[in-house]
């Protein structure tokens, strides 16, 4: 079987079974140990029987509902490879847009100042590690309630050479204890309403951690809790950045405006035209 034939089969088989037809490309890159460019340059190359067997097994497992990223053990985020397992949410492209928005606002708001930045809800460490690597002026902290998630993130920080301070705790509680004031708080909290959770794809619902996805009946529980805790840990001049669920922009904006009446609060749409981020800037 040639590379293009393997991809054609996988695309058709995945589509017939209601899965993303492009997943075959990710899997074949992993099996052949090449990047996408290498794959495209070798479309007419033969793959070995062993590679074909491995490839078809991965594809069948994905059709059964197992996320590709958990099978191959990583996801690419902001151009870097992050180890993932079922203790952490698989990083999404939308969160890369959150990173871009945060970095732009830090530069505009603070310039080259040394800052204390917290990512709340560590997961794989995608947000905290990326911020630490992209801007060396940031002292980055990250907090997660699940020690299992922290262990995954620590592994990623070590592999990628990022300096991040890890706290095991609930939301902003570690900073209440230490008295540390923060210049920037970033979070991609659980925001899926309980009812929507029931209708999610089995690929997500049966494998990714529910604690990282569901935010109460209306999906806004964690944002409400943030509003209670943020005023006690933020500097007067600060930035808050949230990823949100589709349709939650105005609700989260209202919550931030109530907590910080003088802040400039902005709902930002992602590349697909969906409200996906809310930023608050305090002078």
From Swiss-Prot:
Organism expressing this protein natively: Bacillus cereus (strain ATCC 14579 / DSM 31 / CCUG 7414 / JCM 2152 / NBRC 15305 / NCIMB 9373 / NCTC 2599 / NRRL B-3711)
Family under the similarity heading: Belongs to the protein N5-glutamine methyltransferase family. PrmC subfamily.
Binding site for substrate: 188-191
EC number of the protein: 2.1.1.297
Keywords: Methyltransferase, S-adenosyl-L-methionine, Transferase
Listed InterPro entries: DNA_methylase_N6_adenine_CS (IPR002052), HemK-like (IPR004556), N5-glutamine_MTase (IPR050320), PrmC_N (IPR040758), RF_methyltr_PrmC (IPR019874), SAM-dependent_MTases_sf (IPR029063), Small_mtfrase_dom (IPR007848)
Catalytic activity: L-glutaminyl-[peptide chain release factor] + S-adenosyl-L-methionine = N(5)-methyl-L-glutaminyl-[peptide chain release factor] + S-adenosyl-L-homocysteine + H(+)
Protein name as annotated: Release factor glutamine methyltransferase
